[in-house]
Amino acid sequence: MPEALNENVSDTASNGPVAKTRAPPNTSFRQQRIKSWQPLLTPKIVLPLFFVLGIIFGPLGGGLLYASSIVQELVVDYTDCETLASYDEFSAVPSKKYTASFDQSGTIGFDKESTYWKLEKILDKDLDMDVNYCIIRFTVPSVLKAPIFIYYRLTNFFQNHRRYAKSVDEKQLQGVALTADEVKGGNCFPLEVNEDDKPYYPCGLIANSLFNDTFSSLRLLDDNSVYTFSTKNIAWASDKRRFLKTNYSPDDVAPPPNWVLRYPDGYTESNMPDLSTMENLQVWMRTAGLPTFSKLAMRNDNDDIFPGTYEIKIGLFFPVKSFDGTKSLVLTTRSVLGGKNPFLGIAYIVVSAVCVVLGTVFTLRHFIRPRKLADHRYLNWDSEENNLAPHLSDRP
């Protein structure tokens, strides 16, 4: 009887359902049996590697540094123009307020201290009011090859703050006419609707803080000719796709608080903003990752700037002193690698130097006090085992 019972149990076990298992399939990849190769890092391999890296990174760093050095650039910090400049006459811009990186080869009599500014009140016809303009006069000693770009640079402005960066409604930017309740339920807090419960268009902190200083084209004083810049094609194609013409009617929405100066009577059929064509807004809405950043304001892709003395007028609207920031004008050319930024080239050269120094030090160490490969005297576990051996032999 017990034998029959055992037979039934074994039959049931063999014929029953197979138990589920969480073991991975029996493959080379899943069972980690794929063939591998691990290099043996001997001095003959590691030491030449240091020198090879130094030889590679050195010329690369030199090339990057050269590409940055050929970019011609003028940077003027005009934050204090309203307090330091005069309404009566031009005065020299303090040297700490500007940097000029021009090609001066073959230039005779170029004065590095040739940047001046002056304040002037000019009637803004759109605003119907007098506006302070900072007029900056500077000298270009050599030809600036097109394309030429004008950027504005801000410091201590944290566009990467979480509340600021998320304060935008993508549907509204795509032209969807959201109701007040829909805007309140979105991401535009704290600038969603006005006191009349009208949605702000565009809503959110990013749009409200749009950089609104204005830049004129350059005027050459020698012959009073104008070097014209354009505000077209300053936004990336990916940024342009974020914005479409709105389906709002002017009476349904209100301008953001910081836009009221430009739209004192609200939106009308004639001044309703079309975000799909406002490239300055599109550029601004791409938030910067660092508190110091530059954004493209204007460009000229065809005409060179010839040597001479130029003037540019900047309408002063954007406040920066409230957050201890600065604002600067950047007039620049570019190289195949972009604008002037020596950091990457310097970093490559430093890495190259470090590799060569380490390679030299380790090579000298290897020749002065060579170490035998696979010397068992350096195995800690081996020495510990030998130390324990006498004690283990004493055990009963």
From Swiss-Prot:
Keywords associated with the record: Disulfide bond, Endoplasmic reticulum, Meiosis, Membrane, Transmembrane, Transmembrane helix
Location in the cell: Endoplasmic reticulum membrane
UniProt-listed Pfam families: CDC50
GO MF assignments: ATP hydrolysis activity
Transmembrane segments: 45-65, 131-151, 342-362
GO CC terms: endoplasmic reticulum; endoplasmic reticulum membrane; Golgi apparatus; late endosome; phospholipid-translocating ATPase complex; plasma membrane
Any single GO BP term: meiotic cell cycle
Entry similarity comment: Belongs to the CDC50/LEM3 family.
The protein's name: Phospholipid-transporting ATPase accessory subunit mug89
